[in-house]
Structure formats: C-alpha cells, structure tokens
Amino acid sequence: FTICRMPVAANDFALDWYSYNENEGDFAMEKFSIAHDEQTLIPFIQAAQAYNPDLKIWASPWCPPSWMKYSKHYASRSTMKMARELKESLKEGESTYMSKVVDNGLPEDQEYHEGRDAFIQEEPYFKAYALYFSKFIDAYKAKGIDIFMVMPQNEFNSAQIFPSCCWTAKGLSRFIGQYLGPTMREKGVKLYFGTMERANTALVDTILNDAASGQYVEGVGFQWAGKDALPGIHQNYPQLKFYQTEQECGDGKNDWAGASHSWDLMKHYLKNGVNVYEYWNTSLDEGGVSRWGWSQNSLVVVAPDGKSFTYTPEYFIMKHVSHYVMPGARRIETEGSYEDLLAFINPDRSVVVIAGNNADEARTVTFRINGATYSPTLKAHSVNTFQIK
C-alpha cells in the first residue's frame, strides 16, 4: 500500500472518545496535545513507515473538540433513541446489526441532524479550529509523520452515535474559505473537500462555486452513497483529484460475498475517475465489533490471543490491484461484452488486467492487447490479475 488515511483524534473505533484539546475556551490552543496518540496510533503509523518510508498519509476529523459544538458532546445522535427506532423498524424475524447497545449519554433534545451546523458558527471557534488543524500538522511532523492533505470532516451530513459533527455545505464553505484553507496553504498541506457520503452534487457545487472556498479545494473524497455523485462531479470538475475514502464496512463475516461487493465497488470508483481507493479497517479482532456494536470486515483478522492473524478475502481483492497497479498508472478503457474487469497501463508500460468471475462455474474469456490474444479460464467466484510486460 502506498497511501493511507488517519483520524484527527477519535473515530468510531477509538478505544475512548477524545480530542487534542478538551479545555473549553482555549482558543489559543495553548493546551493542545497529541499525547493520547502516542500510546497506539503514532507507533502504528511509524511501524508502517518502517515497511514503506514513502507511505503517504492524509487525515480528517470525525469530531472537533466537544466544546466547539453546540451540544458540547462528541456524538450527534442518541444511542438509545437510535436503538429504539431500529427495533421499531424491524420486520418479524429480522435482527438489528447492532450487537450491543451502550448509552452514549447524549440527550435526545441535543441531537443535531443533517442540514444543521453542529459546529458553533462563530469566528473565535472557526479560528481556533483552523489553529487546531495547524498544531496537529506540526505535532505529527515532529514525530516524523508528514500529513500531506486534510479533509475538513468525515461524513459531514451524518448524525452518528459516535464522534461526529454535522455541517451544512455553507458552513463548511465559510470555514474552508476564510480559515482552514489559508491555514493549510501556509503549511503547504493540500485540502480536499469531504468526506462525501451523499449522492448530492449540489453540496460540492456550493464549495467549489464559492470564490473563497473553491480556490483552496484540490480534490473531493467520496464514500458510501457519495459514490453515486462521483460520475457527475468528475464530469463537471475534471481538474480535481478524486479519492474513494472508506470501504463499505460489511458485517464481520469476512467472506466471499464481502470480497465480491468490494470488487464491485472498486470497479465503480475506478471507472469513474478516482485516483485513490482505500479500505476501512486494516485489522480487527475476530468479529470486528466496533465500540458501538457494529461487526465489520477488515483486511486482517487478529486471533484472540494476539499471536496470529489471518488475511481475509478482501485483503486479496485489494492486493490484486495495489500490488500490480503502480502509482502513476492510468486506467485503460476496454471494449466488448465482458465488463467484469479493470485494465491499467503502468509507468513502465506494462499492462495489468484484473478480471472477475462471480458465477458458480468457471468461465473462459478472451483478451486482445496490442495485437496479442490471451484466453484464460477464470475459476468460479474469483478475481484474477494478469500482467503483460
């Protein structure tokens, strides 16, 4: 792997909820500290850097310091209310995906939902939050970890029961254009808009068509339902870079069905112009249960004793692409009736074809590349990589 995403403070898999400054009113960020990350996150990244010193890292917050939100709480949605609504929506025989329900302490009347700014829309808070990003960049740089790009908010439309923060596009436009954008440019750090989890191109239009915020945005990140906005945004803004920022999380079974879904997602994103495709999570314990009760898939499953691990089918799906498609490669358009494939040309001019077969029986397909013909037989329920040098 050549690029990865990290959280700015807590996310939904964090051992506990925290920010880098929970001292309310410290607008000068005098008590800013990444000490919490020195326990696990920083050593984890440094270990990855030991394997790949050229690993590129970008970051986004799930939540600002809680005192910067109107609710003064990390979460945006009450766990107990969500669990009650899920239970009421179930049909007979159905079960919820939440394996456990833990009260997150957010009063129901303090929820902030899509279409409302949960972040306090006042200049001192905007300035302090931009400074928070700046100090994060500096603190990680001091640890030998360069953050090359940031996105302002993970899933900015989603009111979650874990650390989260809803923003309107207008609120983010103001923050980017007047505060975060100038601060990151001064640091030499790129700024992308995202992460986009809605199929609503107007959200991106609001940011990019504003003269103040649009000048700072060099790309857009998409995940979940945001993938359906990608084709139109790619067509309207071809000058930008596009990232797939989070793999859809699965159900913790880590089976072929999950891998097949990942392959379908890869094809959609890569055929519609993304430059980067990323996974979530890299490694989890068996079952992959998040702190709030969702069993999720991972590339690696760690045994309960912590002494061994297993690569999952989705690890090999990722490897089919990432091991053979080099940075700087370009996707090649293909013709014909067989569409379960991706093709790339690497900087060294080698051609890589990744071909899938989700049928219950083997299938022979024929490729014609540069005048040569290849007719491999693809096993049932498989993904296959061919490299032509």
Positions of PLM-derived features:
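Active-site neighborhood of glycoside hydrolase catalytic domains
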Residues: 127-253
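Conserved, mostly hydrophobic/aromatic
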Residues: 57, 150, 220, 269, ...
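Short, solvent-exposed loop/turn and secondary-structure capping segments
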Residues: 15-19, 68-72, 161-163, 232-236, ...
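N-terminal catalytic cores of secreted or lumenal carbohydrate-active enzymes
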Residues: 1-147, 178
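Folded extracytoplasmic luminal domains of secretory or organellar precursors
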Residues: 53, 148-151, 359-361
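Carbohydrate-binding surface patches
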Residues: 323, 334-370, 377, 381
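Aromatic/acidic polysaccharide-binding cleft in carbohydrate-active enzymes
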Residues: 241-316, 334
